């Protein structure tokens, strides 16, 4: 016992050793609650039974000392038992000595749940916080998994274990279907590049007109024209393969070769040729315009949709170069024309990639591309399962059917049958006739159903996720907040990329300050917990 005499007044101080209960989810510890006078003032800085006034993210509450004493291992419990102001300041973010108020820059929603914990002794999971943010808040306030109520503990632990693996473990893509702020920030950074560019405002609006169909009425019209040209090009390619056009072009080619001229100039129907030239001119206009208006040339050539646009016009110009290299305009002989015809056929086959241009105007096609990009493991597993199954059942079918001469003559010849059987396609061009062969076919079909269904489910879930995410991003950037997007376009004139980052940080600080100023300095009714 310590006895002090201060100005005729005797103070007695006992230093009892108090063993704190085990912190919820933490290790047991011992602490000595010191009620000695403050070394600076000579008297205790707070009474032990004084209510604790706290301010958490703008939410002010009074907590009774008796409620905090029930949980001395928590942060507020240790703050209530702090022996000096210096010790208390280490437990909070700030302290107002005049108002005797402790400030914590933490989530106010979790603090309301924390108040319920001090009343009942049980903590409930908040749906507004993800499991990781909830765990960080609980650790900060000195709570653990044991503090969770029985109704929420199993759900919390399950979400905490499965959430990191509910998506791609090695992928940086967030599992939330809400549009990621980083994706919207990428658009903002791209727009900021026009601030220092020549004719930046005009280029920016033209670029948005070509890239965002929902930006304005001209952008919608441009998108409709682009889709129509793509469909017309695909239709012309399909019509060109009809027998009527093939016979007509073959007769014209024979007549041209007999006259010593190139057959390539007369093979195409005049109408289809003019339509092809118009489509090529439009595609070339699109590629060159996007290249000139792009905020970054380097990013332009890295974007998959831009590469598709380049591939859609590349065969036409390669055909012209091949014709010039092989003497397309001179009568040098039929052999060179034959080589040119083979080259042109290869280049014409590349025109089929024009159908991928529709991905620029289709959310589903873009979602499919993102799904395949993030599902290479599942696709690899699917191919591995199919390869193993085809190899096994092809060998069994060859052994059972090789004497029947029904198409199972060799094991490589059986691979085709095994592939169409495991994928449950079943063309019926090759079928087993023996009992053993039919049993092998039945096992192949059942095995294919099980093997294909496993990775396909994961791929389908990823496609659904990317589709919902893409729709949410489009709604956030173009539809639901169009006016704010227009304000952003006006604000980036003359703004560099660095200044945009600074303004974004300043706005975040301003929103935090606004949250604090919304709460009055003194609440009309103090609440005691």
Curated annotation (Swiss-Prot):
Biased composition (Basic and acidic residues): 502-514
Record-level GO cellular component terms: nucleoplasm; perinuclear region of cytoplasm; plasma membrane; voltage-gated potassium channel complex
Transmembrane segments: 218-239, 271-293, 305-322, 341-361, 377-398, 439-467
Keywords annotated in UniProt: Cell membrane, Ion channel, Ion transport, Membrane, Potassium, Potassium channel, Potassium transport, Transmembrane, Transmembrane helix, Transport, Voltage-gated channel
GO molecular function: delayed rectifier potassium channel activity; potassium channel regulator activity
Function, as annotated: Potassium channel regulatory subunit that modulate the delayed rectifier voltage-gated potassium channel activity of KCNB1 and KCNB2 by altering their kinetics, expression levels, and shifting the half-inactivation potential to more polarized values. While it does not form functional channels on its own, it can form functional heterotetrameric channels with KCNB1 and KCNB2. Each regulatory subunit has unique regulatory properties that can lead to extensive inhibition, significant changes in kinetics, and/or substantial shifts in the voltage dependencies of the inactivation process.
Protein name: Delayed-rectifier potassium channel regulatory subunit KCNS1
Gene that this polypeptide is encoded by: KCNS1
